[in-house]
């Protein structure tokens, strides 16, 4: 996978969720909630699940992983620009976009952009801030 988050300020809030044993997920992957207390790698306009805080190796017997719920991370913009101060949400595999009103209602906002960026740019995001 590409475009994993780069942690700038260490998170202080974490959660533990269930993951599939037969899945490999790189460290710092943006995760989505896919079911009750279950996460998988983000793939679209998904409900925020956190930043994977530990690498998950395929078929290693581990079915629970820790995710960071806050902190400051460098994240990659999807096909559209992100404006300074805007709330952002998932937009694909390890990609973000500007959140719209419906994203707020559905729990998809992941944080606030602390810098602006165009498509494909890396921007700093304060995860957990609204």
Q: What annotation goes with each model-predicted range?
A:
Residues 1-130:
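Surface-exposed, low-hydrophobicity beta-strand/loop segments enriched in small/polar/acidic residues
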């Amino acid at each position: 996978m590409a475009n994993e988050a780069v942690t700038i300020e260490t998170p202080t809030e974490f959660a533990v969720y269930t993951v599939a044993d037969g899945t490999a997920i790189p460290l710092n992957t943006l995760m989505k909630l896919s079911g009750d207390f279950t996460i998988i790698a983000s793939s679209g306009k998904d409900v925020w699940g956190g930043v994977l805080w530990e690498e998950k190796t395929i078929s290693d017997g581990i079915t629970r992983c820790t995710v960071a719920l806050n902190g400051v991370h460098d994240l990659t913009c999807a096909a559209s620009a992100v404006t300074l101060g805007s709330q952002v949400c998932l937009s694909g595999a390890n990609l973000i976009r500007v959140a719209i009103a419906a994203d707020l209602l559905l729990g998809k906002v992941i944080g606030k952009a602390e810098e602006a960026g165009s498509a494909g740019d890396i921007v700093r995001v304060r995860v957990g801030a609204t």
